[in-house]
């Protein structure tokens, strides 16, 4: 069984039962616009929150149990979100483009070899001028527990061609393991 599918048999540490504060603040500031794709959406808290604010939202995740839980939440809350089981590296299987793509903890799961494939496919599902907002673990997070840490330089290198990095700023990745959250980077990246 896949690591993530197995994790969703219980409540994984990153599933906090509400949207990540960073995405709530982005939405409140008006930074998230139009149709939204949530890559690696898990049980859908960020997607459901944005749909509740009036966005048309699609959420994709490779873990069937996560998508099943997201669909149950949408039904219980009476919120319309299209949740799909998809390999997030194969975004080219989605036949539409989005104004905004959000990523709450997906990028930091990618290997160095997977990153170019993801970014190439991401480019195909986001409109020119569209925004990609990524929340990932920072190299400033101490210890070895949890996902891979990502440096600012890795983000800059990965999005060097065809993208403009608006900012990479210190943020918090909320989780159930550490009440203070984990040190993270929040990046705003525009497709050229």
Predicted regions mapped to residue ranges:
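Class I (Rossmann-like) S-adenosyl-L-methionine-dependent methyltransferase catalytic domain
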Residues: 1-37, 43-96, 110-125, 130-192
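A conserved beta-strand element that flanks and buttresses the S-adenosyl-L-methionine
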Residues: 102
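Short catalytic micro-motifs in class I SAM-dependent methyltransferases
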Residues: 105-109
